[in-house]
Amino acid sequence: VFGLVDCNSFYASCERVFRPDLAKVPIVVLSNNDGCVIARSYDAKPYVKMGAPYFQIKDVLRRHGIQSFSSNFALYGDLSQRVMAIIESMVPAVEVYSIDEAFADLSGMPGNLTELGRSIRSKVYRCTGIPVGVGIAPTKTLAKLANHTAKRLQAHTGGVVDICDPEKRDWVLRNTSVGEVWGIGRKMKAHLEGMQILSAKDLAMADPWMLRKMFSVVIEKTARELAGTACLELDEVEPPRQEICCSRMFGKRLTELGPIKEAVATYTMRASEKLRAQGSVCKKIRVSIRTGMFNPDEAKYANGALVQLPYPTNDVRLMTQYATEAVSRIFRPGFRYSKAEVLLMDICQPGEFTDDLFATSQPISSDRLMAALDLINGKWGRGTLRTGSVPVVPDWGMRREQMSQSYTTRLDQLWVVKAK
């Protein structure tokens, strides 16, 4: 039996935790550089579309009294860890699926599972201020569906739905469109509806072998899961990522190569930290740059370069050298650049099989230096030690003009409580 605990409008809920005056005020959260909407509270959804550019909706926000915030990922990450820790304290095994979702193994848990779901919901809210929904079912896909129903009908469900009972499960399947099923995108929805598979129930009753032949094994597993056969296990340990990406919009348009190389060096440093954190090395790096998308008066340009590293590595010095050389090759003067991206590819574990018996490997001295770098930055803060090409305070850094305080991660911004 699986449970899915999903935070409600997570980013917006995080902003409300320390601003009780916004309890009934619609909220949107903006992407890096206050570019576009990436999160909306429930009461903001009728007025603002996901992904809407901020500069296009300022009048809408003002007209409907909607509060906007710059993204504060330090706050969101910290509150996410607190939510996950509470869930882990109440169930035997947890898979953290995303920053605001976790699957829980409820097999063999004593007592009523609906009551357990209510206890999880209550404790998370009491300890963090974050509202969550809980879906309980025999498979992961059904747990997703139960959670969706818990939120959609919250006034009737209290935010918890258990569909282990076949009759309840059948009702939910019949009253859920196929497009709302986990993993069914717009194109797949159109294909399935063309086959008269309109509801989740229709998909559960479809021939799984036919679905596999026409589409993929993924759709076959989805149908089997909806029918009650568990095909997806609980992954307690996150598998190493096969690609690692770091990209940001610049705080302002850049026209010179120097600042763009600084940005690429900075993003390479961030990506290499993630690479070393999972104990991996990479063989290739792809660097890309582009101009803005929304201004019709600006000349458009986008390009990328893929570089092969001399050997699989996680040494930020070597990676930065190759990444900055790559961006130098694709840079063209006369354009106003808005974004750069660094993508680490061909990720593997050190010492994995290679067909070249005499292939060069990363020197032990690099391993020791990178370990020391991560140890110092882990103790004294990110960026304490960095490569010389990474600036301390870049003038192209992210624009976050509406960011809330780091209430839980910075000593100088902690709340002060006075007792009288």
How would you label these PLM feature ranges?
Residues 309-420:
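Acidic, metal-coordinating catalytic segment for phosphate/diphosphate chemistry
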Residues 104-121, 150, 196:
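Catalytic palm subdomain of template-directed nucleic-acid polymerases
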Residues 14-16, 39-42, 142-150, 216, ...:
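Short acidic, glycine/serine/threonine-rich loops at helix termini
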Residues 116-179:
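Long, highly charged, low-complexity intrinsically disordered interaction regions
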Residues 1-99, 103, 109, 226:
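Residues that scaffold, gate, or flank divalent-cation-dependent active/transport sites
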Residues 97-101, 137-140, 280-284, 335-339:
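Short Gly/Ser/Thr- and Asp/Glu-enriched loop/turn motifs at secondary-structure junctions
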Residues 180, 188-334:
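DNA-contacting surface of Y-family translesion DNA polymerases
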